[in-house]
Amino acid sequence: MGRKWTYCVVYTIIQIQFFRGVWEELFNVGDDVYALPGSDINLTCQTKEKNFLVQMQWSKVTDKNDMIALYHPQYGLYCGQEHACESQVAATETEKGVTNWTLYLRNISSALGGKYECIFTLYPEGIKTTVYNLIVEPYTQDEHNYTIEIETNRTLEIPCFQNTSSEIPPRFTFSWLVEKDGVEEVLFTHHHHVNNSTSFKGRIRLGGDYRLHLSPVQIQDDGRTFSCHLTVNPLKAWKMSTTVKVFAKPEILMTVENSTMDVLGERVFTCLLKNVFPKANITWFIDGRFLQGNEEGIYITNEEKNCSSGFWELKSVLTRMHSGPSQSNNMTAWCMALSPGPRNKMWNTSSQPITVSFDSVIAPTKHLPTVTGSTLGTQPFSDAGVSPTGYLATPSVTIVDENGLTPDATPQTSNSSMTTKDGNYLEASSGTDAKNSSRAAASSKSGSWPFPFTSPPEWHSLPGTSTGPQEPDSPVSWIPSEVHTSAPLDASLAPHDTIISTTTEFPNVLTTANGTTKIDHGPITSIIVNQPSDGMSWPVLVAALLFFCTLLFGLGVRKWYRYQNEIMERPPPFKPPPPPIKYTYIQEPIGCDLCCHEMEVL
């Protein structure tokens, strides 16, 4: 009897320990699991066996726990639904003694969403529970697009959270990306700078509230889209895209290419617009009047150049032809540029007005010389085959060949002509500019400059042009420089001759590039030349004065040189020797001091 009670006590103690371990429950809340509709997902929980595994099961948490599958080491698998257990769950054990209990969910839908419970019954640890929250939703991305307009060399600050209606959870990841021309780069990934591009080196940083700072803004930043990707969970993300538009305020410069009138009575104004972005429009004003395209005697050409720095450089050239005495002798011109700025602002940049005078322009003459690029000489007018579309000029004219012509080259224009109507203005045709057309019209089949000259012409090559001879079919542009010319009639004229113009009826002549002419009738002006009585021209006087001054300067230098030679060759002056120095020897007496009167003598 005593032995029986002993067994009962031992058995009771064992049962108490067993039920105490079973009743002790370890509850572990798992992470949220996100899945797209129609996808497959596996839910896995694991445990490390210490003493004894009683059983494990998967259940879906509803109003009551619906058992999905149950596993017992001795009895095997049991599934609550009429499906094969092998396709729903699997129990595996690794080499390290870890047991994995996996639930397979295939082609899931929103109805399968909810909480799933994994239960391990262990002895003596007790019950270990892990709960997974399965969220089945489609992928959504809340995207917002913004545009920021800014000037160059400014600081740009782009927020990541801008007008966000939903509350941002504490657990999220973000990244900054930049995209241009279809190429996307990563700048930052959750506080880590991962972009080493030279275009952003030293210009980009991350500020508070995950703001992106870009300083200074450059032209290359125009059109770039900076995106902040905020990932709340695998099925929901926010994207804030900001496109940058960059503007630059242009610099305007207006110049007059020729400070003196050329042979055809032209004035050329150049308006140069630098550091332009985006493109701008250049308009011209003459005497306060807005020019709308080409008008009578006025021609405008525009050029565009895209610099390597990204800026645009615009150039507008206005050519004014002084066609007759009816026009004003004075003209004030300036250019104005209208360029867009940030926030629908328009920048109005104007140049300084420039006033020029046409007092030196003479009306067209009856017989006009032909103009070529050869040397200048004296040639009388001919009565036929000459185009009357030239203009006389003052004796201070310079010709510069923009295409780098040498004095021996003959410029020609192809497919161009020039005609005069009523003797007042020029009309260009066949696609060449006004300047080349007027030169082509003033040239004939053979001839040279018919004016005597005091100095040979100076030919300049503009940057980017060759110094070789011009091709026969290439157009030629001319810019006046320094050459002395005058107009002969039946004899050569000096530059100081007085020219008086009169008007007569003479047929207009249309000269084409191939030398053919077409005659139209209209009033043409003729000239009368009066020789001055003194017969001395101002260039001779200037040369004489220069010669006289040079002679005086040479005589002065010669005299100074002779004086220096005389000083160098002259013997040194005699100086008598200095008188000899007398030394007085004073001997002190032995045994006594000097007397007072002797001391006074000394």
Swiss-Prot record:
Residues 1-21 form the signal peptide. Disulfide bonds join C45-C118, C160-C228, C271-C335. Residues 250-355 form the Ig-like C2-type domain. It is found in: Membrane. GO terms for biological process: cell-matrix adhesion; negative regulation of natural killer cell cytokine production; negative regulation of type II interferon production; response to lipopolysaccharide. Residues 402-478 are annotated as: Disordered. It is a single-pass type I membrane protein. It comes from the Eukaryota. Glycans are attached at residues 42, 100, 107, 145, 153, 163, 195-196, 258, 281, 306, 330, 348, 415, 436, 514. PROSITE patterns: IG_LIKE. GO terms for cellular component: cytoplasm; membrane. Residues 409-433 have a biased composition (Polar residues). The gene is Cd96. May be involved in adhesive interactions of activated T and NK cells during the late phase of the immune response. Promotes NK cell-target adhesion by interacting with PVR present on target cells. May function at a time after T and NK cells have penetrated the endothelium using integrins and selectins, when they are actively engaging diseased cells and moving within areas of inflammation. Residues 434-448 have a biased composition (Low complexity). Gene3D superfamilies: Immunoglobulins (2.60.40.10). Residues 22-536 are extracellular. Residues 558-602 are cytoplasmic. Homodimer; disulfide-linked. Interacts with PVR. Residues 24-134, 138-244 form the Ig-like V-type domain. The chain crosses the membrane at residues 537-557. Keywords: Cell adhesion, Disulfide bond, Glycoprotein, Immunoglobulin domain, Membrane, Repeat, Signal, Transmembrane, Transmembrane helix. The keyword Chaperone does not apply. This is T-cell surface protein tactile. Its main location: membrane.
